[in-house]
Each structure stands twice: as C-alpha cells, then as structure tokens.
Amino acid sequence: MYKLIALDIDGTLLNSEKKITNEVFNSIQEAKKSGAKVVLSTGRPLPGVTPLLDELNLNDDGDYVICFNGAVVQEVKSKKILSNIEMCHDDFVLINNLAKENNTHVHINTPTNLIIPEETPNKYTIHEATLNNIDIVSMNEEDINDDITFCKIMIIDEPEKLEEVLENIPKDLFDKYTIVRSAPFFLEFLNKNANKGTALEALCNTINMPL
C-alpha cells in the first residue's frame, strides 16, 4: 500500500480540459480512505490551488501541499509553512536590475500575495493575481527587504521582450538560480535548491514518514 502519493496538477491531475475526471476523483478518495497521504505538487501558491484541494477533499488536518515548484511545503488547513527554500533581498536586487536593464517588469511571489516595486501593476501581474486569487501589493523599492518571504521572483512582460531578457541573462545566473519560462509572458527565478524532490523529502521528514 502506498503511504504517500504526490500528484502534479497539469497533465496528471487535470485532463486536457483542465478538469478532474470521475475516475481520478474516485481514485484519490479511495487512496485517502486507505490511509495514504495525497499531496498536490504545483507551481502555484496555496490560494491558487485551494479550489482543487476543496474539490478533492484534501483540506483536512494532516493534508499537505507543495507550492512554488517545491520552494514551499504547507499544511492545507492551518496554512502553516513546514518547509521554505526561499530567496532573499539580494536576489531581488539582482533580478530587478536585470528587468530594468531590459525595460521589463518584475514581481515577487510570497505565500499570500504578489509584491511589485512600482505603483501600477503590469497586466500580466494582474493575470497572475487573478488566476491564483491573491492580492497585489505595491511597495517602494527601498521598503522591500528580507522581512519578506521571497518564494520566487518573476520577470513578466510581452513574449518578445522576454526573449530579449533570456538572451541577455549572464551565464552565471543559470548556475545561481533555477530559471523557468513557465508561460510566454512569465520568466521565473527560484532558489536552485528548491524542487519537488527536496520538498517531498522535507515533508516526509516532518511527518516522520520513511522515504
């Protein structure tokens, strides 16, 4: 019997119509009844995956979720963060300068919102906030500091502008960060140590489940 089942969302949990089939739903309910932990693993924040967790009844005490492609592990019901492989203010400064040099925009993903270092959000930041049911917070650059939980940092803009950014990224940044073009208008930067494998290991250690 499986003790823990980790599921990606797109292409695994959801079909081509972005829906959960009855077969998948029933399989997850059976697994949960058998005592297995069913854990969704996603690039989204917890608010962005909460509707799916509710639909699948994966919102009880003892249910967990892996967010931001492994950067964050959370308890679903309490929202308590169990593991966080975050970035820092120095990372923001570096990536924000890269965005400025290429005349593009940047936002910071925290567990609960999007932070922008400008007054008016880019349309793609609005798209991300709407998609994930989170607020946009505008801050002055000088007020952004290490009190913020930097889950990931994104450069966002028109696809052709992001192509230029990719061409201009110094090679050493590809060694320093995990850089993902998650959509034509999204370029994500994550801590190099953040991935779904390390997140699962952290979760298993937290709940005393042998790997």
Positions of predicted regions on the chain:
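Short phosphate-engaging motifs
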Residues: 20, 45-48, 161-162, 196
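Active-site phosphate-binding/coordination module
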Residues: 22-123
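Core-facing hydrophobic residues within beta-strands of well-ordered domains
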Residues: 2, 60-62, 150
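Asp-based phosphoryl-transfer active-site loop
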Residues: 3-18
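Conserved acidic, metal-coordinating active-site core of Asp-based
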Residues: 98, 102-211
